[in-house]
Structures are given as C-alpha cells and as structure tokens.
Amino acid sequence: MGNEKQILSADEIRRALVRIAHEIDERNGGLRDVVLVGIRSRGVPLAERIAAAIADFEGTRIPVGQLDITLYRDDLKLRGPAPRVRKTDLPIDITGKTVVLVDDVLFTGRTVRAALDAIADLGRPARIQLAVLIDRGHRELPIRADFVGKNVPTSLSERVMVRLRETDGVDEVVILRGSAND
C-alpha cells in the first residue's frame, strides 16, 4: 500500500523479542517467579514468542497467560453497545509473582491502565513489568515500558500496525497515515 511504511521486518521482530527475553531474564535475576501475560489480542502471541525464546536459551518454559481487558477499558461506551469479551486465562496464581504484561504497541497508556486494573482483580503480584514491541510515545497517563522492542516516534495522525503470523498471516510492523492506535 502507498500509505504504509514498514518499520520492522519479520527478522527484526524476532530479534527484538529475543532481546526482550534476555532483558527480562537479566532484570529479574532469573525466571523462577516470572509469569508472562499477553494482553489480547496481539500481546498473546508476542508473550508466547518471548517464552519460546527464553526456553531456547534457558532450557525452561515459563508460564504464559492471556488477559482480556475489555470490561476494564475507560472508553467502553465509545466502542459500541456490545463489547466482545474474550477469555482471560492465567495458568498459575499470580500472587507473589513477577508479572510481565506483554502488548504490541504502547501509545496513550490507557490499555496498560486497564490491564493493571484487571490484574489487580486476579491476584497480588510482587511486581508488574511491561514489555512492548513498539513504543510510539504520546502518553496520556504516567506509564512507561520496562522492555521495548523499538521506540518509534510518530505523529498523532499516524497509526502503528503490528501484523503477526498468528493473527494476520505475516510478521511486520508498519506505519499507516490515518487515525491513531489506542
């Protein structure tokens, strides 16, 4: 398409996720009490890929869960009368664990705020960290990612689109001219 520009290829996405996996291991002094929790929808396959990368270099599989934040969003009324609620699935009790929330794009911070509210209803982790593939700036809330694949300065008129094999049939990140992400 003429109005999109690729900013990450499949190989660049893979490398960014492997780097994030190593950073999670290093920052936490190991992975004994770490749980990855993907924010639906694209955060889930990213969390699975990070867990696979960790398994490759550590030889151990860490738990991966999925979090639906639909009912925790502050823009629920703006999204129409019947929001689509999907399953939240945490494989273990998160109380006392280090939860690493995983999402594709960090923009205003509102999605992460909703995820923090959802996590608080599910347990009391020792700490919560945030891993994102893309940080595009323009925060409306005081939220910062602990692990970032790539910082991509954007204008408010641009949209960052993460496409993944599992959901879109291709791995790439593109910038589109038009309306912004959440």
UniProtKB/Swiss-Prot annotation:
GO terms for molecular function: uracil phosphoribosyltransferase activity. Its EC number is 2.4.2.9. Disulfide bonds: none annotated. GO terms for biological process: regulation of DNA-templated transcription. Keywords: Glycosyltransferase, Transcription, Transcription regulation, Transferase. It holds the Pfam family Pribosyltran. Regulates the transcription of the pyrimidine nucleotide (pyr) operon in response to exogenous pyrimidines. Belongs to the purine/pyrimidine phosphoribosyltransferase family. PyrR subfamily. This is Bifunctional protein PyrR. The lineage of its organism: Bacteria, Bacillati, Chloroflexota, Chloroflexia, Chloroflexales.
